[in-house]
Amino acid sequence: MRVLILSADQFEDVELIYPYHRLKEEGHEVLVASFKRGVITGKHGYTVNVDLAFEEVNPDEFDALVLPGGRAPERVRLNEKAVEIAKKMFSEGKPVASICHGPQILISAGVLRGRRGTSYPGIKDDMINAGVDWVDAEVVVDGNWVSSRVPGDLYAWMREFVKLLK
């Protein structure tokens, strides 16, 4: 499967790095998209190569989506093309994994009303206002959406996401 990660500078390092390597370990092709090709830098200084600019992404060419957290989603959600990618993939029932502030992109896409999920507690009100049945749990699976809260939830988050990809 081809998995797309949407992110930008100031991502939460482990929330991008862990799923990237975990999914590659499972044999999936994993590509990172951001505002432009090159390199993005995490909150703690880790750098990641960007394979595609948002404008180059054709969501039909990907089977699943990962939305890491940190400060990056605040900026990514302002990019019309990135939000369009997330909306299309989520609405088509493709597996989507979000953690921490990652759901901010899905909130902007308007796809979460009536869904059950979790996030970083700091955006709980935003999630509820977007129509999410917010739960304080390490991982929540609702159909094609797997959500988690914080880096401590990474193993449970990816364990459930990998199950969806099989």
Curated annotation (Swiss-Prot):
One of its GO terms (molecular function) is protein deglycase activity. Its EC number is 3.5.1.124, 3.4.22.-. It comes from the Archaea. One of its GO terms (biological process) is proteolysis. It catalyses: N(omega)-(1-hydroxy-2-oxopropyl)-L-arginyl-[protein] + H2O = lactate + L-arginyl-[protein] + H(+); N(6)-(1-hydroxy-2-oxopropyl)-L-lysyl-[protein] + H2O = lactate + L-lysyl-[protein] + H(+); S-(1-hydroxy-2-oxopropyl)-L-cysteinyl-[protein] + H2O = lactate + L-cysteinyl-[protein] + H(+); N(omega)-(1-hydroxy-2-oxoethyl)-L-arginyl-[protein] + H2O = L-arginyl-[protein] + glycolate + H(+). Residues 1-166 form the PfpI endopeptidase domain. One of its GO terms (cellular component) is cytoplasm. It is found in: Cytoplasm. Its main location: cytoplasm. The keyword Ribonucleoprotein does not apply. Disulfide bonds: none annotated. It is an enzyme of class 3 (hydrolase). Keywords: Cytoplasm, Hydrolase, Protease. PANTHER family: DJ-1 PROTEIN, DJ-1_THIJ_PFPI FAMILY PROTEIN. Belongs to the peptidase C56 family. Homohexamer formed by a dimer of trimers that assemble into a hollow ring structure. Deglycase that catalyzes the deglycation of the Maillard adducts formed between amino groups of proteins and reactive carbonyl groups of glyoxals. Thus, functions as a protein deglycase that repairs methylglyoxal- and glyoxal-glycated proteins, and releases repaired proteins and lactate or glycolate, respectively. Deglycates cysteine, arginine and lysine residues in proteins, and thus reactivates these proteins by reversing glycation by glyoxals. This is Deglycase PYRAB04690. It comes from Pyrococcus abyssi (strain GE5 / Orsay).
